[in-house]
A protein has these predicted regions:
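Gly/Thr-rich phosphate-binding beta-strand-loop-beta motif of the actin/hexokinase/Hsp70
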Residues: 49-73
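Mg2+-dependent endonuclease catalytic cores in nucleic-acid-processing enzymes, primarily RNase H-like
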Residues: 77-192, 211-215, 222-224
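ATPase catalytic-site recognition across NTP-hydrolyzing enzymes
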Residues: 1-58
Length: 224
């Protein structure tokens, strides 16, 4: 009963009702700005304290946007994305090198110390540059559908939140959609657009939080 009220769309049909529903429309339709977007500085003024390790998840692009997201654990046991970096070589008409992105990362982090930088494993040259500069790197688990399901669960259960400053991430939550052409052939996959913040978010959640205590990721009632 508790899950029935929390899920909607394709997640509700598959995981609650056990139906094979076509994946269409907004992927994270459970994301609500009024619930998931918070003013971290205001919360800290009211008693939120960040504890333990901090992480950065990165979706790396050359022409496509590169995104850094900073993740911090609150004393309420929820995770907060407290800061966002977004740079598009295409939009800015100027690509950055691996070393320029690493310098941007250092400047963006300032005095913040991180446990790991979580990066898409395909970004080999960028990972090498990070390691050369003394960062500890964890290669992201890039399971797309399982990762999406976990992010959906974390959003639904109120375990992840985003600071008001994370503008591009908020935009992508509203425009990240299922690929309807693929769905017609029985394949679930997102449209490869408006997905760079979404990929970065998924990398962190699926790499670091999938074994988090108290989270049970729903599986479809019936396999296809």
């Amino acid at each position: 009963a508790r899950y029935r009220s929390m899920y909607s769309g394709v997640f509700y049909d598959r995981y609650i009702k056990g139906l094979w529903a076509v994946a269409e429309g907004i992927i994270y339709d459970m994301f609500k700005k009024e619930k998931h977007v918070v003013d971290v500085s205001e919360l800290m003024a009211n008693g939120l304290i960040f504890v333990g390790d901090k992480y950065v998840s990165i979706d790396y692009g050359t022409q496509n946007p590169t995104v850094f997201l900073l993740w911090e654990l609150g004393n309420d046991k929820n995770w907060y994305c407290t800061s966002e970096y977004h740079y598009s070589g295409r939009s800015e008409a100027s690509q950055k090198t691996d070393s320029e992105y690493v310098e941007d990362l250092k400047e963006w982090l300032g005095d913040t110390k991180t446990r790991f930088i979580i990066v898409d494993p395909s970004a080999a040259s960028f990972i090498a540059e990070l390691l050369k500069n003394g960062f500890k790197v964890k290669k992201a688990n890039n399971s797309v559908l399982d990762g999406i399901r976990l992010v959906a669960t974390l959003l639904t259960e109120g375990k992840i939140f985003f600071d008001v400053s994370c503008i591009e991430t908020q935009k992508e939550f509203g425009s990240y959609v299922w690929d309807e052409k693929a769905a017609k052939h029985g394949e679930d996959k997102p449209v490869k657009e408006n997905d760079h913040c979404m990929d970065s978010c998924r990398y962190f959640c699926y790499t670091m939080l999938r074994r988090m205590s108290g989270i049970s990721v729903l599986k479809p009632k019936n396999s296809r």
